[in-house]
């Protein structure tokens, strides 16, 4: 009996089945181990190539890597009196991109621009007594300093930013047009001609390319503006011909143009500003009695915005392709008449107690522009081609069967497993182990070649078998087990 127990042990039976490589025994083990796989598995492999491909695809493409460099660099060109970084703190672009604020003055910048790689800026600044140098690639510009003034001209930096295609507020095209005040005034003349002098009251101004023609000025007193300057620089009040002659002799030593306009005995200056869709208007009057209200001590008062001032700002904001930040400067004479004298861009002065609000408005406009103009380049998926080739394999389960076919053919096994399907299996969809290169839906059992119609039965259960396929499979496995037991009994009693 002990001999019979040893002979009837499952280990011996499995050993005989493995030595003979009888497919039914393999089918019994697979059937008892777990649920039916979606595609036939090779007896020597536990995972099909399709399963491996699915795991590989989901691991490489499904998980989106997080980059540490998810930020855009904003370069603010302004003095150190204002810390612009606090107005962008905590703000995000495109959902999760940070805004890195770099602030410097024009005098601290050097740059190099390439048509392919863009603009690289080097900042050499002195902070807390220490000289610091850092490099960056700006994605956006906010220009709060005058590009050109009485003693400086930073147009070479402006050209470099334009060469690298760096967007800005206002646009670099607009900033370049603001390099000469007579050029801007010429645009205002066009607006006046279109709207009439009553609607757009531009001051009467005369341009001189050099000093020679200045002596033919009409009447006095007048104001002479030499070259391009801000904050009251380059302006002089002339009361008579002798003073004008002296001024003309000084201009002979300079290669600069000049403009003249009648002197207006003013009550106050008018400052109208527009930041996006926000409007403000101020009155400014000199306390010291200086005819230049923007120099020395002055009284400032914010006044309600009327439709006339709003029209001025709207018309000027359309200059040079559009100005996001613009101000209109005017004076009102003691006769009650208004005179528009100039327009400024993004470098305009912020006045009054609303300066913090104005800076927040500018920062919000910068964020909106960056959101629109600084969209990150879409990263190409490195696994795009592999995903297209792996996905059909996982869905159709065709490639795993083909990959296992050479090894099975080398072991003397048939190529097809679906031709000898049981009647229960034939009612459901055909198995995925059909003819190579032909989809399951287009390969009915009756159309298979005759030389593949009688292969040995394959016990691999499939997920595409009909509901009656599993009982048929189980009964067939039991018959195969009984055959093995008969062979074992015959061997035992034959030896006895």
From Swiss-Prot:
Modification type Phosphoserine: residues: 9, 36, 42
GO molecular-function terms, A-Z: ATP binding; metal ion binding
Pfam family, one: Synapsin_C
Subcellular location: Synapse; Cell projection
Any one annotated GO CC term: synaptic vesicle membrane
Effect upon mutating residue 36 to D: Diffused and uniform distribution pattern
Biased amino acid composition, Low complexity: 32-50, 428-441
Main location: other
InterPro entries attached to this UniProt entry: ATP-grasp, ATP_grasp_subdomain_1, PreATP-grasp_dom_sf, Synapsin, Synapsin_ATP-bd_dom, Synapsin_pre-ATP-grasp_dom
Any one Gene Ontology BP term: neurotransmitter secretion
Record key words, sorted: Cell projection, Phosphoprotein, Synapse
Region (Disordered) location: 1-51, 377-482
Key word Phosphoprotein present: yes
Top-rank taxon, per record: Eukaryota
Amino acid composition bias (Polar residues), ranges on this chain: 379-396, 442-453
Sequence similarity: Belongs to the synapsin family.
Protein name: Synapsin
Source organism (scientific name): Helix pomatia (Roman snail)
Gene name tied to this protein: SYN
């Amino acid at each position: 009996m002990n001999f019979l127990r040893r002979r009837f042990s499952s280990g011996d039976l499995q050993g005989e089945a493995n030595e003979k490589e009888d497919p039914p025994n393999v089918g019994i083990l697979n059937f008892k181990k777990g649920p039916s796989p979606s595609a036939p598995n090779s007896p020597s492999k536990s995972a099909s190539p399709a399963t491996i491909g699915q795991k590989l695809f989901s691991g490489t493409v499904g998980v989106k890597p997080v980059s540490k460099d998810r930020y855009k660099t904003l370069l603010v060109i302004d003095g150190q009196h204002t810390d612009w970084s606090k107005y962008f703190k905590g703000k995000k672009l495109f959902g999760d991109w940070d805004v890195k604020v770099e602030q410097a003055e024009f005098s601290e910048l050097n740059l190099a621009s390439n048509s392919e790689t863009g603009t690289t800026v080097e900042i050499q600044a002195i902070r807390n007594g220490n000289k610091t140098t850092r490099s960056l690639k700006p994605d956006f510009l906010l220009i709060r300093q005058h590009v050109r003034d009485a003693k400086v001209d930073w147009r070479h930096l402006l050209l470099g930013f334009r060469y690298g295609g760096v967007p800005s507020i206002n646009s670099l095209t607009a900033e370049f047009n603001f390099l000469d005040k007579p050029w801007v005034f010429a645009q205002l003349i066009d607006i006046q001609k279109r709207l009439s002098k009553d609607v757009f009251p531009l001051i009467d101004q005369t341009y001189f390319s050099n000093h020679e023609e200045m002596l033919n000025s009409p009447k006095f007193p007048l104001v002479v503006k030499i070259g391009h300057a801000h904050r009251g620089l380059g302006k002089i009040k002339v009361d008579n011909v002798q003073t004008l002659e002296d001024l003309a002799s000084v201009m002979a030593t300079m290669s600069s143009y000049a403009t003249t306009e009648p002197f207006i005995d003013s009550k106050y200056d008018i400052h109208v500003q527009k930041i996006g869709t926000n409007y403000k208007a101020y009155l400014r009057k000199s306390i010291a009695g200086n005819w230049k209200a923007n120099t020395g001590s002055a009284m400032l008062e914010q006044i309600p915005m009327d439709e006339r001032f709003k029209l001025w700002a709207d018309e000027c904001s359309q200059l040079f392709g559009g100005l996001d930040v613009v101000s209109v400067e005017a004076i009102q004479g003691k006769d009650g008449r208004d005179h528009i004298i100039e327009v400024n861009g993004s470098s305009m002065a912020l006045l009054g107690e609303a300066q913090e609000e104005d800076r927040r408005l500018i920062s919000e406009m910068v964020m909106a522009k960056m959101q629109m103009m600084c969209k990150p380049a879409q990263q190409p998926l490195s696994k795009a081609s592999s995903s297209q080739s792996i996905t059909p394999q996982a869905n159709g389960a065709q490639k795993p069967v083909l990959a296992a076919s050479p090894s099975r053919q080398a072991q003397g096994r048939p190529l097809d497993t679906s031709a000898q399907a049981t009647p229960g299996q034939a009612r459901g969809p055909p198995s995925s182990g059909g003819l190579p290169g032909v989809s399951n839906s287009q390969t009915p059992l009756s159309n298979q070649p005759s030389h593949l119609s009688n292969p040995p039965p394959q016990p691999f259960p499939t997920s595409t078998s009909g509901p009656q396929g599993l009982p048929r499979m189980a009964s067939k496995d039991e018959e195969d087990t009984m055959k093995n037991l008969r062979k074992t009994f015959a061997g035992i009693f034959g030896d006895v």
